Amino acid sequence: MMWWFLLIGLASAAATASSASSASFESRCQHFHKEIHLQNVHVLSTTYVPIGSNIPMVYNPPICGGTASSSISTIQFCQVALNVTTSDKSQFFMEAWLPSNYTGRFLSTGNGGLNGCVSYADMVYATQYGFATIGTNNGHFGDTGQYFLNNPEVIEDFAYRALHTGTVVGKALTKLFYPQGYKNSYYLGCSTGGRQGWKSIQRFPDDFDGVVAGAPAINFVNLCSWGSRFLKITGPPGSETFVTSAQWSAVHNEILRQCDALDGAVDGIIEDTDLCQPVFETLLCNSTAVDKTSCLTGVQANTVNEVFSAMYGLDGKWLYPRMQPGSELAASFIYYSGNGFKYSDDWYKYVVYNDSNWDHSTWTLADAAAAAAQDPFQISSFDGNISGFQKAGGKVLHYHGLEDAIITSDSSKAYYKHVADTMGLSPSELDHFYRLFPISGMGHCSPGTGAASIGQGSSTYAGDDPQDNVLMAIVQWVEKGIAPEYVRGSKMSRDGTIDYRRKHCKYPKRNRYVGPGKYTDENAWKCV
């Protein structure tokens, strides 16, 4: 089968590990701290975690979920907790999990939002595959920007330094713990984690051989401004510009009415949002309408049109793409609720203006210009020249959900075009090292209405076959040279079984229903 190389790697690792008993592995772990003498690294603990035990998360603070995020270990591993000093005003916390079923592969996980919290779920997922796995708190604990206030060192950790330094430390620990060192290094992250992956590609092209970057928060500063812009468009609840959640439901139904069948199948899922250019004047209330919850006033129709339009600066230059249609049910509670967006608010309060009293209702495009002019430590992570990564032989699998209600998938398509234009490469030339997969029916880093479980984490596991598992797909691409032509997603039922599967096309191709089977038949679709 296609994933034979993974199983061989696991079997080989198991054979190596079995030469030493669990007792010797436990002893090795408990004494490992004596071998760690790395600059600016303070070892907090080394803990042996046996199979079937609760994974200790004693350093995970309540603001990050505390011990509530604990899970049962399916393997035995050595858990190393450390603090790493990055300046006289900053440090980050990290953990390295070193499994007994080690496959010779190193992996770093990313973060989300403005956190601040180790991605323990991703660490569990990767470690069970035999990766020596690390995760950091990205320079501060908690999903908040308050630690950025008047502290550029903490911002630098968040922008790139915690991940890069953690990777350097993690690789050193891996070499210390395993005599054979590591063969290949990988990265797995989504959202902020996706941005971190791209920042590593752009600034540290030798850090990873393979990167899985999902729904990346690239063009980060303008993304923050885009999040602030929605309040300006919608106004507060009760204003004539405000659209209620019930009306957004009507908007969603109208979008599906106009766009669902464009891919050839009426299944409640939009396969290519680029083709979806809805007209909302069809929802205008007539003079006799009694129920105004399912129609729009002219002012409200203008609000909806603005929501689905790109953001341009005071000078008329493009800043950020439109929100893709199809995400409005979730986005109505995130961006269109008539309140500020937390991450955008925090960025302006604690970074742009260093003023915790800044009022999000005052935001204008002048603020967007001020924020963009700063772009501290190039956190926007939108550099189109990734030739260093290309020359290093790196591979990146980039995915983005087409129902993402937090970061529009149009941003990923814009970055793909930016890379192509900057490097002067065609899609077939980019294919050698960079492939983008828009995933229909996927929300923000997680399943939505469609076949969107693609193995990016434990909660979206649908098998070990590389076509069903993006982590295994990047391993196969790096180690066997077999690049993914598609990513097959699974629609999971509540009991954990698979309802149906669908192959998601490599951009810029799009999925088209051609029959003759039902839309749930993966072979009834074709990439065109």
Swiss-Prot record:
* Single Gene Ontology BP annotation: xylan catabolic process
EC identifiers of the protein:
3.1.1.73
Residues at the active site: 191, 404, 444
SUPFAM superfamilies assigned: alpha/beta-Hydrolases
Q: Which residues are glycosylated?
A: 83, 101, 286, 354, 385
**Cited function:** Involved in degradation of plant cell walls. Hydrolyzes the feruloyl-arabinose ester bond in arabinoxylans as well as the feruloyl-galactose and feruloyl-arabinose ester bonds in pectin.
> How far does the signal peptide extend, from start to end residue?
1-19
- Keyword set, alphabetical order: Calcium, Carbohydrate metabolism, Disulfide bond, Glycoprotein, Hydrolase, Metal-binding, Polysaccharide degradation, Secreted, Serine esterase, Signal, Xylan degradation
Give binding positions for Ca(2+): 260, 263, 265, 267, 269
Which Gene3D superfamilies does the record associate with it? alpha/beta hydrolase
User: What is the name listed in the Swiss-Prot or TrEMBL entry for this protein?
Assistant: Probable feruloyl esterase B-1
The record's subcellular location field reads: Secreted
UniProt xrefs under PANTHER family: FERULOYL ESTERASE B-RELATED
| UniProt feature coiled coil, ranges | none
Q: Which GO terms describe its molecular function?
A: feruloyl esterase activity; metal ion binding
Q: What is its main location?
A: secreted
Question: What Gene Ontology cellular component terms go with this record?
Answer: extracellular region
Write out the catalysed reaction: feruloyl-polysaccharide + H2O = ferulate + polysaccharide
Ranked from the top, the taxonomy reads: Eukaryota, Fungi, Dikarya, Ascomycota, Pezizomycotina
Superkingdom to which the source organism belongs? Eukaryota
Does the keyword section mention Phosphoprotein?
no
